[in-house]
A protein has these predicted regions:
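Conserved catalytic core of the tyrosine transesterase superfamily
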Residues: 12, 24-37, 42-44, 48-50, ...
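Extreme N-terminal leader/anchor segments
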Residues: 2-17, 31
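Hotspots on structured nucleic-acid-binding interfaces, especially in canonical RNA/DNA-binding domains
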Residues: 45-62
């Protein structure tokens, strides 16, 4: 190397200064720990966290202690095997497992003997899952006609809520949390943007379009009527209305959707009110849309379902008497005449 280049290199190195002081990567700061805890919590939905919290409280109220061991969890399962649905026990077992994992303890809930115990309980005590009855669009129309007899703000709210929930294929948590800012009024109807949903936990946003109706039901018109009557221009759309007609400022609790549907169904004199729940609106949209000739893909998109199997189950329910092997046999003679 030429001697005259050495001073240049020395000068360049001196200009680099001292290397930055690096913190030990294995010791996160308090702020980072808090941020990490927030991100971990955000990875689980609010409903799931509430369910897990309830499960842990049930285990502790029974007499369990945390951290738990294998015999205690098996004892807990056996104590509730006959009284609780196996699906409920499975959820509580998952909650116990998650608690131990996140607290840094060995997870006894995932041990083979515990899982086999739950499998045995499911086989001995398992029962078919109770499903909400689908609300046919014809019965929704009966409800809307019954509500039109009451010129009250509550009736207007209920009409808008049930129509938006049905034709939008919304979950009860989604329809209860809708805000005016989510609505875009267009010439063909309304477009509703959900900033987050059960199948969109990352918040990419889902848009559901509901066209104007030309018969008994018109969700967009019902919504506009309710908003005008309530004087709502921003914030939560569906709010509490007391017996004097006073409108609250906060959004309805999602459980209120069940109550509203049941009350309105009784007014319409439907004879299967005990079989209804908020999920009846989503199921009803899917089954009624299939009967009306809607495409599978369109039904799936409107309901925001992630899995084809869920939608296929609703379609099979809607056509159980149409595409029926027994029906073909029973009608064979009339078809030959």
């Amino acid at each position: 190397m030429p001697e005259n280049t050495i001073p240049e290199i020395t000068s360049a190195l001196s200009q680099l200064g001292k290397p930055p002081q690096l913190r030990n990567v294995g010791t996160p700061s308090t702020v980072e720990l808090q941020e990490h805890a927030t991100l971990l919590a955000a990875a689980t939905s609010d409903n799931t966290r509430r369910a897990y919290r309830s499960a842990i409280q049930h285990f502790l109220a029974w007499g369990g202690a945390l951290p738990a061991d294998e015999p205690a969890i098996i004892h807990y399962l056996l104590a509730h095997a006959a009284a609780l649905n196996p699906r409920t026990l499975a959820l509580r077992l998952t909650a116990l497992s998650q608690w131990h994992v996140h607290q840094g303890f060995p997870d006894p809930a995932s041990l083979p003997t515990v899982r086999k115990t739950l499998t045995g309980i499911s086989r001995v005590h398992g029962k078919p899952k109770k499903k909400a009855k689908a609300l046919p669009v014809e019965d929704l129309e009966r409800i809307i006609v019954a509500l039109e007899q009451f010129d009250t703000v509550k009736a207007k709210r209920d009409s808008a809520l049930l129509q938006i929930g049905f034709f939008g294929g919304f979950r009860r948590s989604e329809v209860a949390s809708l805000e005016v800012e989510f609505i875009k009024w267009q010439a063909e109807g309304i477009a509703i943007t959900l900033p987050r949903s059960k199948t969109d936990q990352e918040g990419e946003g889902i848009v559901k379009a509901i066209p104007y109706g030309d018969d008994v039901c018109c969700p967009a018109t019902a919504l506009r009527t309710w908003l005008a009557a309530a004087g709502i221009t921003s914030g939560p759309i569906f709010r509490r209305v007391d017996k004097w007609g006073k409108i609250g400022a906060d959004a309805l609790h999602e459980s209120s959707v069940n109550t509203i549907l049941a009350e309105c169904a009784r007014r319409a004199q439907l004879d299967y009110v005990p079989e209804l729940s908020s999920h009846s609106l989503r199921r009803g949209m899917a089954t009624s849309a299939h009967r009306a000739g809607a495409d599978f893909r369109d039904i799936k998109r409107q309901g925001g379902w992630r899995h084809d199997g869920t939608v296929q189950g609703y379609i099979e329910e809607a056509s159980q008497f149409e595409e029926n092997a027994a029906g073909s046999l029973l009608r064979r003679n009339s078809n030959n005449k």
